[in-house]
Amino acid sequence: MQLLSQMESISRQTIYDLQSSLSAELGEDYFGSATTFVAAEIDQITRKAKILSVGDSRAYLIDAQGKWQQITQDHSILSELLTDFPDKKEEDFATIYGGVSSCLVADYSEFQDKIFYQEIEIKQGESLLLCSDGLTDGLSSEVRENIWKQYDNDKSRLTVCRKLITKQGFYDDLSVIICAF
């Protein structure tokens, strides 16, 4: 979208602007179309990053040993249930609860859902990875961490992830960007 290419900085206001832009650009022809969103703005000198998300697209900090730490909080029914019932696990709930509870929609309304925003510091040897749920729904955290330990560069790691996901019977869209420090 044109708006993203013109932004100098991201903040919570970015989501409200994107909702308006999405509705203006797509509302007439694609009314009700929806998307999740994740973005990062990184200051390469201070290694500080602003992380912004809506829905179940995620940001991860990956350490030098290949351990993945989820930065963002999913805006899904399941995530809300897990917050309300801390003694339960994902497997304890029906898969229908994985639905997104917050997203950007081309429907001419103002954005009124949940926004995740956090500022983090990235250390030398760490990587920041942004992805759609096609990556995390298709590969468990254990599989992703094993891939990170087994391969020594991000291109190989992400290629293996893509191939494993493509082999599965179902396939969701898969978008990934990684920045290593």
Question: Where do the protein language model's features map onto the residues?
Answer:
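PP2C/PPM-type serine/threonine phosphatase catalytic domain
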Residues: 1-181
